[in-house]
Amino acid sequence: MNKNTIIGFILMAAVLFGYSWYVQPSEEEIAAQRKQDSIENALRQKAEIAQKNELKAKKEQAAAAAKGDTTALFYQALNGKNEQLTLKNSKLQLTVSTHGGYVSGAKIMGFKDIKGDNNLTLFSGNEQKLNFMLAGKQDNIVTADLFFTPSNHTDSTLTLTAEAANGGQLVLNYRLGKNYLVNLQVQAKGLNGFFAPNYRQVDIEWEGLCRQQEKGFTFENRYATLTYKEKNDDSDYINETEKVTDEPMEFAIDWLAFKDQFFSSVLIPKGDIAPNSQLSSIPQEKGSGYLKQYIAKFKTDFDPTGAVPTEMEMYFGPNDFQVLKAVDEECSFDKDLDMQQLVYLGWPIVRLINRWFTIYVFDWLTQWGFNMGIVLILITMLLKAITYPLVKKSYMSSAKMRVLKPKLDEATKQYNKPEDAMMKQQAMMQLYSQYGVSPLGGCLPMLIQMPIWVAMFNFVPNAIQLRGESFLWISDLSTYDPIIEWGTNIWLIGDHLSLTCILFCVANILYSIMSMRQQKDQMVGQQAEQMKMMQWMMYLMPVMFFFMFNDYAAGLNFYYFVSLFFSAAIMWVLRKTTNDEKLLAILEARYKENKANPKKMSGLAARLAAMQKEAEELKKQREARH
């Protein structure tokens, strides 16, 4: 990278920051925009409320008409008492409403909520609904309108029955397992004549509000998605925007998930979710207590004879990799669910690192009962031990170039003009070749470490084991740790300062200074001048990291801080244990050996030599013309 390129990067960064600052609205403009936004939000909410009231009125009118229609098939089930019945085990407590027959509440045991309660409420009241709509020849059955009669009610089982006038029944059977799965069977009995002969699919509407469960609204919102798994493919999610997202799915789907950062509601039909399902994600206002509203409209298999019930499993639980992996074994359906994909582990190569290394090491350390902060430190130490040979190789390559610097200065002092840059480079490469030193020897090992850095970037924010865990001054490793907070949002910063983010950025600056000093000792001529420009970019990166990571999990910032500390310690130890005189003696011996038995130039050196020869020929031709 030459001087002009570095200056170009710095200027581009300056232009971007300058433009961002310039276009930033003034306080008056912000106030005016807030007022305008408030007006628009009020109008939008008013329109939404009016639309909802209109739909509600139509439904109530239709329900009232149905209740008054004594000839309706399920006339008797249109009136009744709404009871909230409980299913529970040691990990999950569900509430089932007899009006509509759906799971109206889910409480996950052993996980604290944002208010500090020991059991987390995933949803309650009208926050989530599941509605089955069965189309008949002359009439429709809508489970949301029906009152079901409960029977066979235990902690793990519940049968809900809606009686038809002709003696037929619509039966919902719930069966709660030992963990987070509940099985639901929907069966029509004695209703065969009600449906058309070719009726084979039931329409389902699943709607839910995603609660804000964590402290940071913006950070948690990034991981709240309506996720689905395409049949015979990987999972995906509908694109998130600030506006309503409504996407038709033109393919069959294995399961749907209303996903939050650490918890999910998942619906898994035994049959496929038919193509052309409609999925919607509606962002909610900050401060409302909700992140998004999810709506899924789809079809799945239905047997009107009642011989085979429409069956599905519902998962209400944590986004824990091992727990989700076990769902494949617990689920009785013949499907490859891969629900562990709800825990995002990064791009393919990064996912492999997290899938086959990070998770197992993390779980192994966790089972010993260590504090999660200690676990992060131990993982850092293990990763540093694994990558130590690469780091040492990189350092030794730099050390060799450092001890050869006087010889490089001597060999290249005659090439001071800009037009001599190619000759200077050739002289340096020739000297490196004679001493058996590769100038690129320190680059590849460092590049190999990058996937590990990115892997932890994806793993830590999704590790539910860090949720609610404290360490030192950090009250919760899964969210930011504010050293100071204020009520208003400041551009690029937010409404707080994270202490671990500050420590990470300060450590980054100190480590950059340490690295730059070491690299300066091995630079020659123009390279040394370029290094002066490069150091400003190195100082700029921590500033950019501050704006990026101020809202991130304290556990991630703490990991990067500890990682930089160990990197600096390793570099210091290597510097203290490297004897420059002995290293130079080894290189001199290699120089004599190579001089006595010259080796063929490497590919890079050969190409540079060819380029040098071509440059010299062109120079001679230009001089001959003049």
Regions found by a protein language model. Give the residues of each.
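Helix-loop-helix
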Residues: 1-56, 96, 186-189, 205-220, ...
